[in-house]
Swiss-Prot record:
Superkingdom, taxonomy of origin: Eukaryota
Organism the protein comes from: Homo sapiens (Human)
CDD domains associated with the record: humanin
Keywords, ordered alphabetically: Cytoplasm, Secreted
Reported induction: Down-regulated 6 hours following staurosporine (STS) treatment and up-regulated 24 hours following STS treatment. Down-regulated 6 hours following beta-carotene treatment, returning to its basal level 24 hours following beta-carotene treatment.
GO BP terms, alphabetized: negative regulation of execution phase of apoptosis
MF terms (GO), sorted A to Z: receptor antagonist activity
GO CC terms of this entry: cytoplasm; extracellular region
Name the UniProt record assigns to this protein: Humanin-like 8
Family of this protein: Belongs to the humanin family.
Broad class of where this protein is predominantly found: secreted
Length: 24
């Protein structure tokens, strides 16, 4: 896996996971 792909995926997951945790 390329570092860019991993970083992008991790960042995207964090952005989606953060709001979800805040709502919960």
């Amino acid at each position: 896996m390329a570092p860019r792909g991993f970083s992008c995926l991790l960042l995207s997951t964090s952005e989606i996971d953060l709001p979800v945790k805040r709502r919960a």
